[in-house]
Amino acid sequence: MKIYHIPAAPPLYTNTFLLVGENGLAAAVDPAAGAQEYLRLLEQEGARLTHILLTHGHYDHVGAVEELQRKTGAKVWLAPQDACGGELFPFTTPDNAYADGEEIRVDTDLAFRVIATPGHSAGSVCLLCGGLLFSGDTLFAGDVGRTDLPGGSWDTLRKSLKKLCAAVTENVQVLPGHEEFSTMDRERANNRYLQF
């Protein structure tokens, strides 16, 4: 498996990712804006985008979805709670809804386990892929996602963080939706929001 970090330009500053499996099947995680870089990397790898996996539906995580879907035929995964449309949630029609705990297999060496983590938004999920945790806006390095936006709830996020810590016991790399990367061990030790 190969992974490409594609940071979105200002003002979004979203961490987005393209993962390519050994047989050339690929997944995009939170393609924020500008489909061109994804398409260039897919061509460079001789890969085919089959999955677009969204950690939640906020505008700064979905900007390239429509163009990527149109140009590649990839299917979109998103929790139905976040497919509602509006200012913060552009209308994104998912082809598939997440089920908590399900495995989404993209290629023989590329699979994601879904961990439902509502709180930042009603439909937020984290995606565990081997030693990588795509945490969206649920967990950041030293911080957590805000809960003052529509669909957000601090009480729900706290429960989700406890669940996440219980579900991810190994020291995986945390790849959040914004800012720097971290590890679960570092977050357990230093993130005040994970001190239960």
Each model region followed by its residue ranges:
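Conserved beta-strand hairpin/beta-sheet module of binuclear metal-dependent hydrolase folds
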Residues: 1-45, 126-136
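Short beta-strand or tight-loop elements
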Residues: 2, 108-113
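Hydrophobic residues at beta-strand termini and immediately following loops
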Residues: 6, 98, 117
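Active-site HxH/HxHxD metal-binding segment of metal-dependent hydrolases
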Residues: 12, 33-110, 192-193
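Residue in the alpha/beta-hydrolase core beta-strand immediately N-terminal to the catalytic nucleophile
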Residues: 27, 53, 115-116
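Hydrophobic residues in well-ordered beta-strands that form the structural core
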Residues: 29, 76-80, 135, 176
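Metallo-beta-lactamase
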Residues: 88, 92, 111, 116, ...
